[in-house]
Amino acid sequence: MSDPGHAALVRDAPLLIAYDGSEGARRAIDVATSLFPGREAVVLAVAAPVTVREALAETVGVVQGFEEANESVALETAAEGAARANRAGLIARGRGEIAVPTWQGILDVAGEIGATAIVMGSHARTGLREALEGSVSHEVAKHAHYPVLIVPPRRA
């Protein structure tokens, strides 16, 4: 029986780098570049359609404005990450998406592009903070059919 994750490593498909602009995401690009120099990559930033606060806005036009702003931020963040990845030595393009939950958006794009692997940084949340905020990297790893490289934060 064929393992789709293993097959993905054999193909010459792009990496998917999840990028949110954080130090962990920047480090993930650096690690991806050192492991896969010159590789094609899609740098993905995922934003929520609207936040709870935004959803409480009274008019449809206001909510629609928030959705457009969130999409714009995702596109800008992805472009920033792609520029960083290109400077580091990958052949990267940015992509912004709107999805809830974030991890599902990452997996959807990985499937769409046939990613070789998913690379992402970790925010290293623990305890109560992780229970309240969740861990996108853990959810991606748990549900993925692709290899997932979770890059830990730099040690102090």
Write out the residue ranges for each language-model feature.
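Glycine-rich, Arg-bearing micro-motifs that act as flexible, cationic patches
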Residues: 12, 117-143, 153-156
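Solvent-exposed polar/charged
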Residues: 34, 111-112, 142
